[in-house]
Amino acid sequence: MNYLILISFALLVITGVESARDAYIAKPHNCVYECFDAFSSYCNGVCTKNGAKSGYCQILGTYGNGCWCIALPDNVPIRIPGKCHRR
């Protein structure tokens, strides 16, 4: 049993674990990338440039009209609850 756990852990480490999430991509200061046209390719471009599979403009979403990304890598900042601190 211990060997099975050890081998499973070794395979996990060797192959690496990459995760992705669906979320609003964030600019610095916790602000979303704003969009106004649901049929525009702007959000898809922003999302794919940052490593996501795709993206679209979510009209009247939780944080207003913002870019929603599908399968965004963990190293890319996402919008978290709290204020957008624009300067």
From Swiss-Prot:
Propeptide: 86-87
CC terms in the record's Gene Ontology section: extracellular region
Molecular function via GO: sodium channel inhibitor activity; toxin activity
Superkingdom in the source lineage: Eukaryota
PROSITE patterns: LCN_CSAB (PS51863)
Tissue: Expressed by the venom gland.
Compartmental location: Secreted
Disulfide bridge positions per record: 31-84, 35-57, 43-67, 47-69
Range of residues in the leader sequence: 1-19
Keyword list, A-Z: Antimicrobial, Disulfide bond, Ion channel impairing toxin, Neurotoxin, Secreted, Signal, Toxin, Voltage-gated sodium channel impairing toxin
Biological-process GO terms, alphabetical: defense response
Location, primary (coarse class): secreted
Pfam families linked: Toxin_3 (PF00537)
Domain LCN-type CS-alpha/beta stretches: 21-85
Miscellaneous information on this protein: Negative results: shows no effect on Nav1.2/SCN2A and Nav1.8/SCN10A. Shows a weak inhibition of inactivation on Nav1.3/SCN3A, Nav1.4/SCN4A, Nav1.5/SCN5A, and Nav1.7/SCN9A.
UniProt comment concerning the protein's domains: Has the structural arrangement of an alpha-helix connected to antiparallel beta-sheets by disulfide bonds (CS-alpha/beta).
Function: Alpha toxins bind voltage-independently at site-3 of sodium channels (Nav) and inhibit the inactivation of the activated channels, thereby blocking neuronal transmission. This toxin inhibits inactivation of Nav1.6/SCN8A (EC(50)=790 nM) and drosophila DmNav1 (EC(50)=280 nM). The toxin (1 uM) does not significantly shift the midpoint of activation at the two channels, but induces a significant depolarizing shift in the V(1/2) of inactivation of the channels. Has antimicrobial activity.
Similarity-based family: Belongs to the long (4 C-C) scorpion toxin superfamily. Sodium channel inhibitor family. Alpha subfamily.
Protein name (Swiss-Prot/TrEMBL): Sodium channel neurotoxin MeuNaTxalpha-5*
Source species: Mesobuthus eupeus
Lineage: Eukaryota, Metazoa, Ecdysozoa, Arthropoda, Chelicerata
